[in-house]
Amino acid sequence: MEFRFNCHPLFRQRIVRINNSLLPTGFTAPCRRTALDATAQISEIINFIGQLSAQAQGLSNPVTTSQKLRNSDHHIYLMFEPNEKHGLVVGILKVGHKSLYVFDQNGETVNVTAPCVLDFYVHESRQRGGLGRELFEHMLNEEKIQPQSLAIDRPSGKLLGFLQKHYGLYNKIPQMNNFVVYEGFFSSKQNGSDIDGRRMHITASTSSSTNNHHAPPSASTNNNEYENNHATSHDLEEPAAPQEESPQDNEDVPEEVLSANLQNLNMADASDYVDYHHHHQLQHAKSGHEVTFADDYGEIPEPTADPDPYTFHPHHLELQNQQEQQKQMMINRENSASPQSISQQHTPEHPGPRKPIRYTKQHTGLKNMSSGVGAAVTPSAKMEFDQEENEGFGSVKINRPIGKSNTRNSLHSGDDNESVHSKGSDSSHMTEHGHFDLKFYHNKLW
């Protein structure tokens, strides 16, 4: 894989190791600008090869990127092939330590921090030429580890065949995650030191933790030490059993003292030798509450039948008298009502004791009209409405007679002044109902 920049200054060796500083081992920069340029070039190389490795493995996202390497303690080994131009980068190998939960040969889950192969890729044009084994051997020598002590992350078929061919790794230990481990993984010195003290005992029953039952000793635990620890924990957990007093000692003690002592005892500590029913009766006797049995309910009188709801009561006469008085008051009010009081309207009689509702001017719509003005502008039998043609929605032309003429011809006599004329308006200015006759153009409401 050739790049646009010259790779020879970056690769002083055939295989270089790169950590989270994104600078190859053995690289020296004369100035800060040179170091920044080298970091940018190494980042471009890692991102490009990581994308090719993901495509070869059928992954949607690359496993190896420069950003992931900067935020971790993993290592990347890059293989370089010099030429007359910028040089070629032909392979990549990413390794690092991870904390894993894996199954051992006995099926027990253990937590180990083991070296892992996270990404391994050689360009297709350079495969089957021994470059992959050269890169892998260089990594084993640098990390000082054995092939069987490695955990492989999502190995492809080619990688599994590569390990079988060159290192004889055939027998795999089944795991529940994406890592593959081989026999000999737990027997190595490095992984064995990480396993100590972190072995997990998984049982099918969950009551062992709640009942303080101890798990059986594992294969790596000494039986004598387990028995000593088991006996010591029982000595610490089990409380001392209370000693029972002889009946001769209790005969000389008064009953009041015994009952007081029983009340002060904790129920959890005295549950082995104190009868709960006897203690319950003592508590009721102390507080003065006695238990009532079913035989004591015989003296309770039986409930009598409900009285007749329709029986006569003297209060009914008072209600009838009040209703009759209210009806009489309503009749007198209707007879004494004057036509001048517009605010008072006739209301229907109420059969019950409720008072009639009084309607005000606000309810009737005559809020802005006085008594005289309301009668003057209210349409009466003397007013005629004449609309000879359609003048639009809501427009009504009112033609009122001139003087005392009540004929149809007087409406078109040539006088356009429209007025309201009532009887006796020339002399007494009073209508036949006793109201003042006001012209519509004299009223401020018009």
UniProtKB/Swiss-Prot annotation:
Keywords: Acyltransferase, Transferase. GO terms for molecular function: tubulin N-acetyltransferase activity. The keyword Aminoacyl-tRNA synthetase does not apply. Residues 413-432 have a biased composition (Basic and acidic residues). It is an enzyme of class 2 (transferase). Residues 1-186 form the N-acetyltransferase domain. Residues 204-254, 335-359, 385-432 are annotated as: Disordered. One of its GO terms (biological process) is neuron development. Residues 204-215 have a biased composition (Low complexity). One of its GO terms (cellular component) is microtubule. Its EC number is 2.3.1.108. Acetyl-CoA binds at residues 120-133, 156-165. The record marks Q57 as: Crucial for catalytic activity. Specifically acetylates 'Lys-40' in alpha-tubulin on the lumenal side of microtubules. Promotes microtubule destabilization and accelerates microtubule dynamics; this activity may be independent of acetylation activity. Acetylates alpha-tubulin with a slow enzymatic rate, due to a catalytic site that is not optimized for acetyl transfer. Enters the microtubule through each end and diffuses quickly throughout the lumen of microtubules. PANTHER family: ALPHA-TUBULIN N-ACETYLTRANSFERASE 1 (PTHR12327:SF0). This is Alpha-tubulin N-acetyltransferase.
